[in-house]
Amino acid sequence: MGRMHAPGKGISQSALPYRRSVPTWLKLTADDVKEQIFKLGKKGLTPSQIGVMLRDSHGVAQVRFVTGKKILRIMKAMGLAPDLPEDLYYLIKKAVAMRKHLERNRKDKDSKFRLILVESRIHRLARYYKTKSVLPPNWKYESSTASALVA
């Protein structure tokens, strides 16, 4: 998929293994993986951070192949899912950091332009999540209250 606000085509990506079966050398069962997700979710880790932890320390390449569900679905079933989707959360966090930078550097025109691009991405993503009913229909991004969302 191409980039939204950059000329890059975005061709490079990691390839998933062709086989969707669990590797024979993996000793963890689906219940063990779900238990690990529960422990890491209790600590406040995001689904992508949990996936990295499981991959690096437990050798679970794809949680979906082992458990049959994605990490976020498992977290939702356990009641540990974040209230804001992860990609939207990090875009808001980036916008808050850019606003803080612009308060200190008022003449930074390029950062002001990039902030407009980031905020347009936030609005676009919020519109998508409203149609998928992940966010409530009356949810609105406001720059004044954004720092409270990511704090």
UniProtKB/Swiss-Prot annotation:
Superkingdom of origin organism: Eukaryota
Gene Ontology cellular-component terms listed: cytosolic small ribosomal subunit; nucleolus
PROSITE patterns registered for this protein in UniProt: RIBOSOMAL_S15 (PS00362)
GO molecular function, one term: small ribosomal subunit rRNA binding
Presence of keyword Ribonucleoprotein: yes
GO terms (BP aspect): translation
InterPro entries reported in the protein's UniProt record: Ribosomal_uS15, Ribosomal_uS15_arc_euk, Ribosomal_uS15_N, uS15_NS1_RNA-bd_sf
Sorted UniProt keywords: Ribonucleoprotein, Ribosomal protein
Keyword Mitochondrion: no
Family assignment from sequence similarity: Belongs to the universal ribosomal protein uS15 family.
Official protein name in the record: Small ribosomal subunit protein uS15
Taxon lineage: Eukaryota, Metazoa, Ecdysozoa, Arthropoda, Hexapoda
